[in-house]
Amino acid sequence: MTIEFATRYRERSHIPTEPGKPYFIEKGMGDRAHLFTDMFTVYAGGEQTENTFNFFTCEGPKGDVIPAHSHPDTYEVFYITDGAVRLFVEDLEGEQYEKLLTAGDFGFVPKNCPHAYRIERHHSRIVGVAAGPGGTFERFFENLGIPTDELAVPQRPYVPEPHKFATVPQQYDVNFLPDHKWRTGN
């Protein structure tokens, strides 16, 4: 059984707020949020790691490419445990890369690099880790999306109100790039 905590972020959380304390979370019982068609589950964040890294999963159905974005101060990794995810990345010189990642594959996105992804198979899962000098961005998902106690992807997509795109991302080291074009062909 996973213990519940009240935090400044959520009324009910399975993640303790104090850094330096061991804890355990059962599968899927982290802090969950729905955003678009995906479910994000945070297992460790800035509160537990003194803002050095976060650890989360993203589960979703086959769908559209998420909006291109970058993180000025955050490095991000994509490790695929189930399904297939197409990762798009542009390096700092402007060269674009595209790679279909399947179970066991890994992708690394340096800070400041525009990137996006598209889930290519239903029931895909990404394990994400992000770290950088500016802190961590795991609370972005529940602030742009909606916190949930559900254990599955949303029945209907959750699309944030337009005004949230103007305020929430900057608080969490996320810069959306609405005019960005991928030239890789997919």
Predicted features along the sequence, with ranges:
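Short histidine-centered beta-strand/loop micro-motifs
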Residues: 44-46, 66-72, 89, 98-99, ...
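Conserved metal-binding segment of the jelly-roll/cupin
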Residues: 100-121, 131-133
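A short, N-terminal "cap"/entry segment at the start of jelly-roll beta-barrel domains
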Residues: 1-53, 155, 159-186
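Double-stranded beta-helix
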Residues: 118-186
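Glycine- and acidic-residue-biased ligand/ion/polar-headgroup-sensing regions
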Residues: 73-86, 90
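Short acidic-glycine-tyrosine-enriched beta hairpin
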Residues: 48, 52, 91-111
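Structural motif
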Residues: 84-86, 114, 123
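Residue-level recognition of conserved beta-strand positions in structured domain cores
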Residues: 55-57, 70, 89-91, 119, ...
